[in-house]
C-alpha cells in the first residue's frame, strides 16, 4: 500500500515483417506503457506510421465532427457491432453528406431568423409612431428624422434654429418623428439643428405602407422560420437516433486503428528491424510473453530488461531482471531507449483505500520512488472529519451523498470522491453515536446510552456543555498533531535515506522529527511544572509524563535542533520554532471546528425547540470515555422538544411553542439552519482536515509528479471483432 506496484521494463525486438502482428498482440494484451524512442540507438530512427494512418486519422476527425454536430452522447449507443472497412467508406460518407445538408439548412434558417428579428427590432419603433413608412422619406425639400429623445428639447432646438423655417413633431409612446422645412436649400439643416440635443436617430426601413402591417408580416415570417428550424431539429434528432450507434462504434474502431498505425512512431526502427520498449507490472510479464509468442511464435525476442527499484539515485535506479524470457529473433536489438526513462505509477491500494487516491491526486500522483500516503489519508481524514462534525444525522446524510456520487457519475474521480464522502459520513455517524447526538439533539444519549445501556451520559462530549471536554480536546488535538506529523517525518526520512543516504535523511527529516517530538513530549511532561510551571494544566488532561521523560524529550529536541542547523544552516535554526511547535499547534483547529459546529447546531435547536438549564443541587461526578475520564457536572441543559414545560431556567422558549406562526417560522429555521450546518461541515471541517493533510502532513515528505500508467490498448465499449 505504501509503494506502487512494481514495474518491469520490457523490450520486444524483431523483423519488420512481423511488425503488424506484434502491434496487434501488444495492443490486445493492453499491458505495456510504451516508452518513446529518443534516437539513442546507433543506426535506428523513429519508425514511420503504418499504411492507412493518415486516412484513418482523417476519418476519425470526420466522425468526431459529426458526433459534435449531431450531439451524440454515450447514452445514444446501441448494441456492439462490427464496423467494416466498407462501412467506413460508404456509410460514413452517406451520413456525412446528409448530416452536413441538414446542418447547412439549419444554419441558413438561423441566419434568416436572425435577420428577420433584426428587422422587427428596427421596425417596431415606427409602428409605435404610427406613420406609414413611405411618408417618412423621399421628399425633395422636406427633411425627416425619426428616433427617440426629449421632445421638448427637440422643439426648442428647432424653434431656435434660423436654418429651419417650419417644423412639426409627431410622437408615439417612445418614438418621435420630426418634419422640418429648411430656410434655404440646406440639406444639413435638420441634422445640424439636432446636434447636442438628446436624440437618437433611427434608420427608416426600406418598406411601404403601415408599419404595423410590416411588423406583423415580419413576425409571421419569424414564426414560419422558427417552425422550419424545429422541423430540421426533429430531422436531426431522428437522424442522430438512427446513426448514433454507428458513429460511436466507428469512432472507437478508427481510434484503435490510429493508435495501432501510429505506434511505430514510438519504436526504434530500421528498414529491416524494430525495437519497442515499455513498462508493465512485473506480475504480468509472463502473461505478456505468452501473448506475444502465441501471436508470432519465435519471430521476436521478448526480454525483461529490468525491474524498477524503489530507490532513486539521481534518476530512477533499475535493477536487472532475475531472468529473461528468451526467444529467437530475426535480427533486433535490446539496447535501452533512455536510461532516465521512469516507470509509470500504479497505486497499489485495496478497494476501500483506493477511493482516497482522488485526494492524493489533487496534489499529484506519487512518484514511483516515494511513499504513497493514500493509506494514511484513509486512516486519518475520515477520522478528523468525523471527530469535528460528530453527529449521527449529518453522518447519514454525508454517507448518502457519497453513495449517490459514487453511483451516479461515470467520472472515476467523482466516483472516488463519493467513496471518500461515504467514509467521512460513516465516521461522522460513528462519532455522533459516541457524542450521543443526532442533528445536535441528545436523542442518542437519551435512548441509547442512558435509556438502553443505563449510562449517566454519552461516552464523549463535544465540550459545549461539559467544559472539561473542551480542554481535553484542545490538548488531544496537539497529541493528534504530534502523531500525524511524526508519520510524515518518518516517511520523509525513508524517502530521503533511499534517495540521498542516511546522513542527509538524518539532517533533514530526522532532525525535524526529533525537534518536534522532543518538544511535544516535554510539553506533556511535568518537568519544571511543580508549583505552577510554564504550561497550562489542561495539557495534563490527556497525559502527564514524568519529569525524566520530559528531560529526555528536551535532550532529543536539542539533538534535533543541532541536526537541523547542520543540515539547513542559519535558515534551519531560524525555522526551528516552526518545526518544534508551530506545526503542532496548527492541529488545535480540530478542537476549534468541533466546538464551532456544535455551537451552530445548538443555536438552531435552541431557536426552534427552546431549552432550559438545571443547576444541580449536588454536583455529580460522571465517568466518560468508558471510565477513562471523569469530570464533575454542576448544571445540565435540556431541549424542550415535545412541550414548552421547563424544569429550570429557560434559556429561550422556542419558536415551536409560540403558536402557529412560530411553528411555521420554526420549521423554516430548522430546515435552513441544519442545511447550513451541513454545508458548512464540508467547507469548514472538510477544508480544515484537508489543510492538515496537505499543508502539515504532505509537506514533510511528499513531492509527487509520477506518470500515470497508460497501457497501449483500448477498452472496447461499442465494437466487437467477433
Curated annotation (Swiss-Prot):
Biased composition (Low complexity): 326-335
Cell location: Cell membrane
Keyword Protease part of the UniProt annotation: no
GO cellular component: plasma membrane; proton-transporting V-type ATPase, V0 domain; vacuolar proton-transporting V-type ATPase complex
Biased composition (Basic and acidic residues): 309-321
Transmembrane stretches, start-end: 384-404, 419-439, 474-494, 505-525, 554-574, 590-610, 639-659, 662-682
Membrane topology value: Multi-pass membrane protein
Reported function: Component of the A-type ATP synthase that produces ATP from ADP in the presence of a proton gradient across the membrane.
Protein name: A-type ATP synthase subunit I
Organism: Halobacterium salinarum (strain ATCC 700922 / JCM 11081 / NRC-1)
Gene name for this UniProt entry: atpI
Amino acid at each position: 500500500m505504501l509503494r506502487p506496484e512494481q514495474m518491469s521494463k520490457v523490450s520486444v525486438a524483431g523483423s519488420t515483417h512481423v511488425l503488424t502482428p506484434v502491434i496487434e498482440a501488444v495492443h490486445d494484451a493492453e499491458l505495456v506503457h510504451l516508452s518513446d524512442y529518443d534516437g539513442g540507438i546507433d543506426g535506428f530512427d523513429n519508425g514511420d506510421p503504418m499504411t492507412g494512418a493518415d486516412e484513418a486519422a482523417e476519418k476519425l476527425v470526420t466522425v468526431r465532427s459529426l458526433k459534435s454536430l449531431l450531439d451524440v452522447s454515450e447514452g445514444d449507443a446501441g448494441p456492439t457491432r462490427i464496423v467494416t472497412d466498407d462501412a467506413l467508406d460508404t456509410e460514413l460518407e452517406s451520413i456525412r453528406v446528409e448530416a452536413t445538408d441538414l446542418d447547412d439548412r439549419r444554419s441558413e434558417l438561423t441566419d434568416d431568423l436572425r435577420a428577420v428579428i433584426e428587422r422587427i427590432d428596427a421596425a417596431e419603433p415606427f409602428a409605435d409612431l404610427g406613420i406609414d413608412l413611405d411618408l417618412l422619406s423621399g421628399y425633395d425639400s422636406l427633411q425627416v428624422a425619426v428616433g427617440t429623445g426629449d421632445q421638448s428639447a427637440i422643439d426648442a432646438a428647432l424653434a431656435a434654429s434660423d436654418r429651419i423655417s417650419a417644423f412639426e413633431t409627431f410622437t408615439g409612446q417612445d418614438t418621435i418623428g420630426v418634419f422640418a422645412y429648411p430656410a434655404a436649400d440646406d440639406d444639413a439643416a435638420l441634422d445640424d439643428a439636432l446636434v447636442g440635443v438628446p436624440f437618437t436617430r433611427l434608420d427608416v426601413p426600406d418598406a411601404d405602407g403601415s408599419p404595423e402591417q410590416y411588423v406583423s408580416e415580419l413576425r409571421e415570417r419569424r414564426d414560419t422560420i422558427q417552425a422550419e428550424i424545429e422541423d430540421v431539429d426533429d430531422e436531426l434528432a431522428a437522424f442522430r437516433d438512427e446513426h448514433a450507434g454507428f458513429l460511436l462504434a466507428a469512432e472507437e474502431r478508427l481510434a484503435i486503428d490510429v493508435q495501432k498505425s501510429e505506434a511505430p512512431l514510438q519504436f526504434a526502427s530500421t528498414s529491416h528491424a524494430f525495437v519497442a520498449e515499455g513498462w508493465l507490472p512485473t506480475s504480468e510479464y509472463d502473461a505478456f510473453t505468452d501473448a506475444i509468442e502465441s501471436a508470432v511464435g519465435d519471430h521476436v525476442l521478448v526480454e525483461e530488461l529490468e525491474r524498477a527499484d524503489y530507490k532513486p539515485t539521481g534518476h530512477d535506479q533499475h535493477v536487472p531482471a532475475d531472468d529473461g524470457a528468451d526467444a529467437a529473433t530475426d535480427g533486433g536489438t535490446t539496447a535501452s531507449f533512455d536510461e532516465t526513462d521512469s516507470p509509470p505509477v500504479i497505486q497499489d491500494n485495496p478497494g476501500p483505500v483506493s477511493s482516497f487516491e482522488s485526494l492524493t491526486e489533487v496534489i499529484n500522483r506519487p512518484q514511483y520512488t516515494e511513499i504513497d500516503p493514500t493509506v494514511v489519508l484513509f486512516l486519518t481524514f475520515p477520522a478528523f472529519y468525523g471527530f469535528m462534525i460528530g453527529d449521527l444525522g449529518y453522518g447519514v446524510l454525508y454517507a448518502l451523498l457519497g453513495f449517490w456520487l459514487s453511483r451516479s457519475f461515470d467520472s472515476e474521480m467523482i466516483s472516488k470522491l463519493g467513496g471518500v464522502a461515504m467514509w467521512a459520513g460513516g465516521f461522522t455517524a460513528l462519532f455522533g453515536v459516541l457524542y450521543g447526538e443526532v442533528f445536535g439533539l441528545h436523542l442518542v444519549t437519551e435512548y441509547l446510552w442512558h435509556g438502553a445501556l443505563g449510562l449517566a451520559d454519552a461516552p464523549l462530549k463535544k465540550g459545549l456543555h461539559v467544559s472539561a471536554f473542551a480542554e481535553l480536546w484542545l490538548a488531544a488535538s496537539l497529541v493528534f498533531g504530534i502523531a500525524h506529523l511524526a508519520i510524515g517525518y518518518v516517511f520523509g526520512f525513508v524517502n530521503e535515506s533511499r534517495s540521498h543516504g542516511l546522513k542527509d535523511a538524518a539532517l533533514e527529516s530526522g532532525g525535524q522529527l526529533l525537534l518536534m517530538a522532543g518538544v511535544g513530549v516535554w510539553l506533556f511532561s511535568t518537568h519544571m511544572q511543580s508549583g505552577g510551571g510554564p504550561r497550562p494544566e489542561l495539557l495534563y488532561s490527556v497525559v502527564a509524563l514524568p519529569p525524566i521523560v520530559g528531560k529526555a524529550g528536551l535532550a532529543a529536541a536539542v539533538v534535533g535542533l543541532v541536526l537541523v542547523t547542520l543540515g539547513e544552516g542559519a535558515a534551519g535554526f531560524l525555522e526551528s520554532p516552526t518545526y518544534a511547535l508551530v506545526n503542532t499547534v496548527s492541529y488545535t483547529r480540530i478542537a476549534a471546528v468541533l466546538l464551532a459546529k456544535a455551537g451552530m447546531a445548538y443555536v438552531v435547536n435552541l431557536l426552534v425547540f427552546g431549552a432550559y438549564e438545571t443547576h444541580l443541587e449536588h454536583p455529580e461526578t460522571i465517568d466518560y470515555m468508558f471510565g477513562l475520564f471523569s469530570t464533575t457536572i454542576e448544571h445540565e441543559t435540556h431541549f424542550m422538544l415535545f412541550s414548552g414545560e421547563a424544569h429550570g431556567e429557560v434559556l429561550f422558549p422556542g419558536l415551536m411553542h409560540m403558536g402557529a406562526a412560530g411553528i411555521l417560522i420554526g420549521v423554516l429555521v430548522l430546515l435552513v439552519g441544519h442545511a447550513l450546518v451541513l454545508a458548512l461541515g464540508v467547507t469548514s471541517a472538510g477544508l480544515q482536515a484537508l489543510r492538515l493533510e496537505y499543508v502539515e502532513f504532505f509537506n514533510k515528505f511528499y513531492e509527487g509528479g509520477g506518470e500515470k500508467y497508460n497501457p497501449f490498448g483500448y477498452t472496447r465499449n461499442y465494437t466487437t471483432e467477433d
